[in-house]
Amino acid sequence: MSMKFNTENPSYEWVVFQGKSFSVTVKGWGCEGSYKWNVYANIYDNHPLFCNPEAAKCLHFHGGCTYDKYITTDETEYKYDWQKQYKTLKVGSDYMHYMDYFEDENPCNGIPFTIKWDAEQLAKELLEISGEHNVE
């Protein structure tokens, strides 16, 4: 699992699972007493759900899917023949629903257990759909 920290806008992002056709990330951000949490599935163009965003929204998400967007990543300059434009379907959920209690969970302390469990279940579901095998 890797972690990234952005000092301009305090946020933490963990890669909970990285597969060949998708990754699952958890993001924690905010300031003292008002933290926000998100879980995202980043679905690549070689995953069966990439062309079916409606089905992707039905994945295991806390409170349902609250975010979906196709994201295009492009190289600033193409120097090599392997460089190309990449598209990702990013779908996710937040933990800011009525009766959620994660506002006090500081990302400095890591991912709260419930959120990590949700992210792991999402990864298992995406693995099953993709036919990939977990090599951990």
Protein language model features and the residues they cover:
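Acidic interaction surfaces
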Residues: 1-136
